[in-house]
């Protein structure tokens, strides 16, 4: 009995993640989180998109700002945040992404450049549209985020789904992310719509909660 009581006492002090509710927010089904928490973390410092994506994810799960302590060692320490890798075909990864979000769990996604036609600048990019939260809804802004390199790509925290997404016919553009490159713009929350054919299927495409 004494041992059981000690175990229960120790467990009481362990961090407990909770699933975040997926709710419609001005036309985007977004995991619930305190906007001020994400804004306080802000945009990434150079080369640390993976760490910042992890911090956003843990902040959503824990309901408090994640400092990122112990989650970086010349690269993101996924296990320190309770995340593990998931690989598969593009269709399998997108289905996993959908199911994780539906269960209230943010997913870290690895992006690569894709070539976009019909644009004058930055034909190779990881995204095109971002949405700034205002008092009256989302302002759509054309702001291409360029992957830092073809070697490392770019990591984002996916936290939203289009309300029109078909679970049996998913594409990257059905999902919305907290992008470490621009999670805040002029003091407002910004979410980025993923661009089709940017999921880096061949190179650690997803990190999911273990």
Predicted regions and their residues:
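Substrate-binding cleft of extracellular glycoside hydrolase catalytic domains
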Residues: 70-96, 101
């Amino acid at each position: 009995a004494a041992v059981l009581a000690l175990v229960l006492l120790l467990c009481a002090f362990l961090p407990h993640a909770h699933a975040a509710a997926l709710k419609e927010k001005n036309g985007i089904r977004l995991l619930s989180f305190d906007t001020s928490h994400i804004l306080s973390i802000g945009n990434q410092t150079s080369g640390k998109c993976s760490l910042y994506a992890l911090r956003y994810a843990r902040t959503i799960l824990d309901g408090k700002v994640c400092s990122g302590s112990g989650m970086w060692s010349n690269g993101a320490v996924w296990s320190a945040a309770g995340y593990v890798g998931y690989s598969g075909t593009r269709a399998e990864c997108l289905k996993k992404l959908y199911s994780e979000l539906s269960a209230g769990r943010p997913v870290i996604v690895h992006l690569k450049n894709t070539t976009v036609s019909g644009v004058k600048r930055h034909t190779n990019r990881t995204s095109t549209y971002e949405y700034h939260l205002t008092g009256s809804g989302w302002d759509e802004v054309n702001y291409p985020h360029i992957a830092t390199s073809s070697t490392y790509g770019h990591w984002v925290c996916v936290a939203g789904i289009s309300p029109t997404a078909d679970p049996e016919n998913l594409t990257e553009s059905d999902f919305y992310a907290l992008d470490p490159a621009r999670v805040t713009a002029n003091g407002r929350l910004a979410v980025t719509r993923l661009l089709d054919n940017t999921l880096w299927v061949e190179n650690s495409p997803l990190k999911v909660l273990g």
